[in-house]
Amino acid sequence: LLAIEKAKISGIGTVVVRNSTHFGSSAVPARLAVEQDMIGVAMTNAGPEMAPWGAASGVVGTNPWGIAAPSGLGFPVVLDIALTTAGKGMMQWYQREGKKMPLDWALTPDGEETDDPAAAMKGALLGIGQYKGYGLAMLTDVLTGVLGGGGFGLVPYSNPAKQDVSHLMIAIDINWFMPVEEFKARMDAFIGDIKAAKKRPGVEEILVPGEIDHRREQDYRQNGARLDAVIFDQLAELAQKLNIDFPFEREVVDA
């Protein structure tokens, strides 16, 4: 919110946060800017789960990015990604299902690529685009922890009492560049060009970032959210331990 207020004054607002903790989905703070007809950027560092290119152990984090921009189509364009090929949550799912995972996701503790999720959970994650993801993750640490005077690299989450995570928030006030309705019209034209592109064989529709999530949100609001059964049970158990009301019923539905 501070970045948004700064953007109202000068067109762009940049805030670095230190001594923080997990801030959830990076799309959430980015979308706060969209609600004010701005472009939002949010990124955070994280625990050292990603191996630098050529290394066998983790030094940088998954370091997610969220970038959100308004459109005139009823939903914002939202990119919400971690900089690793996959996260350990997905690997846990593969492990529970007894399945092998792709080789380019993670390394064993010895630095070997593996398709065994159990071995991967003990090792390090790999960056998207090989060395490119590592480079982006390192520079995310620079823009958050190093610049903000907070934790970076091996430090975040190393001390449970002080998790020392750092974030970067940027808000860009579109009205300083052009009327927001003109921006939305230009966005819609751009999206139209993307959706009109020649499709690959077997592809029914070309989507833009955030579109699947928008459709899923509409479905969940109408029909209820779908959760992995294990996660549902974990949430119910946690609520019971904390004496929190959990007014939801476990209903098995077809995938």
Which residue stretches match the model-derived regions?
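Generic secondary-structure signature for well-ordered alpha-helical cores
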Residues: 4-9, 35-39, 45, 72, ...
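A glycine-rich, acidic short-motif signal
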Residues: 1-65, 69-76, 81
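N-terminal nucleophile
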Residues: 41, 60, 64, 82, ...
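Catalytic-core signal marking the mid-to-C-terminal active-site face
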Residues: 155-255
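Phosphate/diphosphate-binding glycine-rich loops and adjacent basic-rich segments that engage nucleotide
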Residues: 50-118
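Conserved active-site and cofactor/substrate-binding residues in soluble primary-metabolism enzymes
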Residues: 2, 24, 28, 62, ...
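Short glycine-rich or small-residue beta-strand-to-loop segments that form or flank ligand, phosphate
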Residues: 13-18, 127, 169-175
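Small-residue-enriched flexible segments
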Residues: 87-149, 160-162
